């Protein structure tokens, strides 16, 4: 039996019956929350957040962390709604670790704890550990890469206007003797090929700004905020995620995202839409031992059609669209009420943790 099945069997046949003997009958959402917490093993990541015996003893950070996961599972728009529900639901309150209503911390305490989790990248660490443990040992057929807009209530960063530098237009043809031609700056994609994951991620802009995309009807739409780049595998399981400024083109995060995914799982095919049609991305995918299947971008001339076999495989890319919509519709992706890239990423990661656990267990159905 697989470790994943052992965990599922223990939850279904041991943990649920015991909890229902101690609590009221569990709802479907409460059962989902329990499965997410058990698979994510969030308690293993709490050492940096425990009280060290200095100063006033603070509220239990593990209970607050589990409450934030519940916020994603229940798709609550605000922390205030979460706290109100914890006061009303004896089951969920006790599942998080608070026996009485008086033990539930204030909204400001929740906010301070969330800031601590964000500074430490706790959501990313929990998700990475869960993916490596439960998806890493298995061979993944397809990695579907995509980006989705993240709309926030934050003032966008605006660059200081600079006076345009007018360069004298040089004549076509060979340069004259002694003429010095300024070298072109290397493109980010070219630089990424020779750098590691940490350096590539650090190079991506993460300030809140304005992004623009063309929707399914061909109209341009804009939003203020960020862009979430996600790699997902068959079964609608998110494997890796990066947050960038909204204005960053999808292709600029492809290589660092591929590096992150390659550290976590072994896969065969990389599926991407025409936004990722760049020779650097194709070559890096092949360098990883993958087969890149990328919809061509008709920049010049007519659009090249895929061969029939690749076209069939490319249909699996709908995985990315389902993960994006699942995050936004069911796990808090539309209710980003925090500011700053670190906090926004933590909020979204709690949703991705819930999706990952839920979809992994669905593989057993």
Set out the residue ranges of the language-model regions:
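Charged, often Cys/His-bearing segments associated with DNA-binding zinc-finger transcription factors
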Residues: 1-45, 362-365
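Basic, short loop/linker segments at the boundary and entry of helix-turn-helix/winged-helix-like folds
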Residues: 27-74
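Structural motif
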Residues: 53-62, 220-221, 338-348
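Short, positively charged, Gly/Tyr-enriched micro-motifs
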Residues: 57-125
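Catalytic-loop motifs flanking and including active-site residues across diverse enzymes
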Residues: 63-66, 253, 319, 323, ...
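Polybasic low-complexity intrinsically disordered regions
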Residues: 107-288, 297
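Helix-centered, glycine/charged polyanion-binding patches within enzymatic domains
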Residues: 274-342
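Charge-patterned, long linear interaction tracts outside catalytic cores
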Residues: 342-365
